[in-house]
Amino acid sequence: MIPPLRMALSGGGMLGLAHIGALEVLQERGHLKCIKEYLGTSAGALLAFCICIGYTLSELRTLITVFNFTKIQNLEPEIMFSFIESYGIDNGANFEKLFTVLLRAKGVPTEITFREFSEKFADRPALRIFATDVSRSSLKEFSLKNTPDVLLKFAVRASVSIPMIFTPVEDASGSLYVDGGVVSHFPFHTLTEEERKRTIGITFYKYTFLNESTKITNILEYIQRVCNSAYYQKDERLYKEWSRQIIMIRTSNASSMNFEASSEEKEALMNAGRTAAEEFLVAPHSKPKRRYSLP
């Protein structure tokens, strides 16, 4: 396999924990040595953010195992009852606190912009985060190239804002941003054909092949399923055409919104990621073609 230059991490809520297992396998096989940038949407954006600001996969595995994800919820009555005006029942305040803690723990200024990050941490991979610009009904890329003066934590907060659950974030121009998964949960789609050739994408069967029946157990999964249904038909062809560059993770009946997941359930997700990556690397398309010399 040609060493990839970038990783594209899809959204998927709690399923995003499986990305860590897949990345661990790629790292163990030496496939992350040439990575220059990480692209992420929603949960994938949060993980990409963590990696770029300096967290190792080992640190993330430990952090995720002990972290209580229910702590990111901020369901205060006054916020919930203002839903009509704020467009969400959770203002994302705890998410923002989490981003601040993550940045501070790695010695990264909490108010750092994409431009400042590229200048201060030039040796780190670049970061491209995707959210949905509701005001323009389009996908928004936050990056050094497109939004140099935007805060990293603003971009991540925008990308993880599940519509109607978390309030959207607003920029100086008045544009509102929500979860990038509303338009496309997998940033691999945003790349040119040449870029895709040097990219490994990681996503989930649960959100790429909707003809595989999945039981919907709560309102959050319902919202996510509605969003995924909107772009499934146009995406199916791309997944098949670029299967040699995409790791598909099977997560069985795991819920994307199970914030109360036990350490065993988290471990199972990360192991699912490892299994998918191992299968991907032994597939025929991952093996280099043998060259023969004329006698």
Regions found by a protein language model. Give the residues of each.
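Patatin-like phospholipase
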Residues: 1-41, 49-295
